[in-house]
């Protein structure tokens, strides 16, 4: 069993047959070696006990019940005085039943079998190392054709057949008879190679360092040739150079990890521990079995048949042996990756069997569901909505979620303040949602950040820390500026919330993970907190000066008459000076709150003289004179009030309440940053 305190990482790769045997083989106290699964059976239909040497054998994988052997005898586990440590009658050790979760077995294959991941997955590692087409290797693995072994300076039967086949026609009838004689096995093993054994021999003969040297030389030669002018030839050369680079990298990986290429062909097939492929009894006495058990049974049946053909029947036709080897290869392929070669294998109900690949890959696989993405305590999940009134470092947490996440902290607060005598009373107060509970919850949440995570977490900005705030409803409120880091929007996205418990986790959340500490992309340094979606629409509406709004089109036939009537009315009554004048922005916003003006209504706002920017060459649109001698020069976006001596008395700019509100927000933000900078220096 893996000790979580001693092992910090897990490496997945190819292993040698010796390593597989070491994992699965164990020596009993009487010296007997067990570990090989030879029978395709699971449980006996009468006794309901595991079959000996089967897929659930207690001798191989350990007892089903701790300290109880297959005979029913009991021994105390860990007692040094208990002797013997195993049952001499059934051969089952008196150990903890948890051994069945990690004790492996193995199947000794009657013929080598290629691992389908290394053959069929793209890129094909076997095809890359051997520098041969994948279709050719597939035909060899599945016994569609054979190749002759290179035997130099020796006459071979294949050469003789090639010489005499066309000279002596009678040999055409005598040669096939030779392939069915008893001596053909010796000839076949000497001169003919097919199946995964042929692949294994070629991989074993490879020298990885020579492959690297030859590939580099060929790559340099192709680079020296340059462009030929033929687009098709240039693409062919480019693909060849890319292939050579992949081949060199693959060979270097094998050398660096001390992996032999022939390990990609299996001689021993590991058998998973029984607890990882269980058989469960459901209501009514029916049994539910993992699909992997059925696939293992299929492999054992075919492997035993091939063993019988090779050992007992010496006169078996070679075509039958090759066909059975192909069936064993296909059975192992289905066990490892069902459907990788085409149509997947199905059961009697036309349901596809779940192979080993299906068990470990994907969102519901062993890694993502039970190891990486498993459910944890002190976490929740809900839909996110926009929180326009939130600060950048805050998030709105629904009361229902908050009271569950911080329940233990609230209980401790109630007991410390003597508002509850024990845990039971505190839980009762929480269930009844007494007002004091929400006060304690507010105190607890003030100094405790939470972590928000949106799957998939592709980079560090996928999980950030926030200061929680209680909100009504059942949705998590989020500031729209942090959406880009999460790659989130408000169309139904869900986010998970976690509570950091340890002091180290809380310090890390405050110093490194708070949203206002992650304003720039860690990858390229660009701003990550930029307005998007709702904020862009809001800024457009806020600064839009069109009195007709952004959704009305005056060129629409339905709106043309209304627009013409409004234009005619404006020409008769509308004057620039009829628009309201305000001496400061506070008066303008106050008038808007009193509903005397609209958000996009044009108005005149007095501007400070030291901040004016006036184009000297611009001519006024209109000039209005008053009886006292003062006059107004009206331009496109501003108005100047001059005295009788043409001195500037006031300057008014033409704006809207939306522009004023945006300007004040920017001004306050800049002033706040300046104060913070001055305090820091």
From Swiss-Prot:
Mg(2+) binds at residues 489, 491, 493. It is an enzyme of class 2 (transferase). Transmembrane segments: none annotated. It is found in: Plastid, Chloroplast. GO terms for molecular function: DNA binding; DNA-directed RNA polymerase activity; magnesium ion binding; zinc ion binding. The keyword Zinc applies. Binds 1 Mg(2+) ion per subunit. Binds 1 Zn(2+) ion per subunit. The keyword Transcription applies. Its EC number is 2.7.7.6. Its cofactor is Mg(2+); Zn(2+). GO terms for cellular component: chloroplast; DNA-directed RNA polymerase complex; mitochondrion. Belongs to the RNA polymerase beta' chain family. RpoC1 subfamily. DNA-dependent RNA polymerase catalyzes the transcription of DNA into RNA using the four ribonucleoside triphosphates as substrates. In plastids the minimal PEP RNA polymerase catalytic core is composed of four subunits: alpha, beta, beta', and beta''. When a (nuclear-encoded) sigma factor is associated with the core the holoenzyme is formed, which can initiate transcription. This is DNA-directed RNA polymerase subunit beta'.
């Amino acid at each position: 069993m893996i000790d979580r305190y001693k092992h910090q990482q897990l490496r997945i790769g190819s292993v040698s047959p010796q390593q597989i045997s070491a994992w699965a083989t164990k020596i009993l106290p009487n010296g007997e070696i067990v570990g090989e699964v030879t029978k395709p059976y699971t449980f006996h239909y009468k006794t309901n006990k595991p079959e000996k040497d089967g897929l659930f054998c207690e001798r191989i994988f350990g007892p089903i019940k701790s300290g109880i052997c297959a005979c029913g005898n009991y021994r105390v586990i860990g007692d040094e005085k208990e002797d013997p440590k195993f049952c001499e009658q059934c051969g089952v050790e008196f150990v903890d039943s948890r051994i069945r979760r990690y004790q492996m077995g193995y199947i000794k294959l009657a013929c080598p079998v290629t691992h389908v991941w290394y053959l069929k997955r793209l890129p094909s590692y076997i095809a890359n190392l051997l520098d041969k087409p994948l279709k050719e290797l597939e035909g060899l693995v599945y016994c569609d054709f054979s190749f002759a072994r290179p035997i130099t300076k020796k006459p071979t039967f294949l050469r003789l057949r090639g010489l005499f086949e066309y000279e002596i026609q009678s040999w055409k009838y005598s040669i096939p008879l030779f392939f069915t004689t008893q001596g053909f096995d010796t000839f076949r093993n000497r001169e003919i190679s097919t199946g995964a054994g042929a692949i294994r021999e070629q991989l074993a003969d490879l020298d990885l360092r020579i492959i690297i040297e030859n590939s580099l030389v060929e790559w340099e030669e192709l680079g020296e040739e340059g462009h030929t002018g033929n687009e098709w030839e240039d693409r062919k050369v480019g693909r060849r150079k890319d292939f050579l680079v992949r081949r060199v990298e693959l060979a270097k990986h094998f050398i660096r990890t001390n992996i032999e290429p022939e390990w990609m062909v299996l001689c021993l097939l590991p058998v998973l521990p029984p607890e990882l492929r269980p058989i469960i009894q459901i209501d009514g006495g029916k049994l539910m079995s993992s699909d992997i058990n059925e696939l293992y049974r299929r492999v054992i049946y075919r492997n035993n048949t091939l063993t019988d053909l090779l050992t007992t029947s010496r006169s078996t036709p070679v075509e039958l042996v090759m066909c059975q080897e192909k069936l064993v290869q296909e059975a192992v392929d289905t066990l490892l990756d069902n459907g990788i070669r085409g149509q997947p294998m199905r059961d009697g109900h036309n349901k596809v069997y779940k192979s080993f690949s299906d068990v470990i890959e994907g969102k519901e696989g062993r890694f993502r569901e039970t190891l990486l993405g498993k459910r944890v305590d002190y976490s929740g999940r809900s839909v996110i909505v926009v929180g326009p009134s939130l600060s950048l470092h805050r998030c709105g947490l629904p009361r229902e979620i908050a009271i569950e996440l911080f329940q233990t902290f609230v209980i401790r607060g109630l007991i410390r303040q003597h508002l509850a005598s024990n845990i039971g009373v505190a839980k009762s107060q929480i269930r009844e949602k007494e007002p004091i509970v929400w006060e304690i919850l507010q105190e607890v949440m003030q100094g405790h950040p939470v972590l928000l995570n949106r799957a998939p977490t592709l980079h560090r900005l996928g999980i950030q820390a926030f200061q929680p705030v209680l909100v009504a409803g059942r949705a998590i409120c989020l500031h729209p500026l942090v959406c880009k880091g999460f790659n989130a929007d408000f169309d139904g996205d869900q986010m998970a919330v976690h509570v950091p418990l340890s002091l180290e986790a809380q310090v890390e959340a405050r110093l490194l993970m708070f949203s206002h500490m992650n304003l720039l992309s860690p990858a390229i340094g660009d701003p990550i907190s930029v307005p998007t979606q709702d904020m862009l629409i809001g800024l457009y509406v806020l600064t839009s000066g069109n009195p007709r709004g952004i959704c009305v089109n005056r060129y629409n036939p339905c709106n043309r008459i209304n627009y013409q009537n409004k234009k005619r009315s404006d020409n008769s009554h509308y004057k620039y000076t009829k628009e309201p004048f305000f001496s400061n922005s506070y008066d303008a916003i106050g008038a808007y709150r009193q509903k005397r003006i609209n958000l996009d209504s044009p108005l005149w706002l007095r501007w400070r003289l030291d901040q004016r920017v006036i184009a000297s060459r611009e001519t006024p649109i209109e000039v209005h004179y008053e009886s006292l001698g003062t006059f107004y020069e009206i331009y496109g976006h501003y108005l100047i009030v001059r005295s009788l001596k043409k001195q500037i008395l006031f300057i008014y700019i033409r704006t809207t309440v939306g522009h004023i509100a945006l300007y004040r927000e920017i001004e306050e933000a800049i002033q706040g940053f300046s104060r913070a900078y001055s305090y820091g220096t």
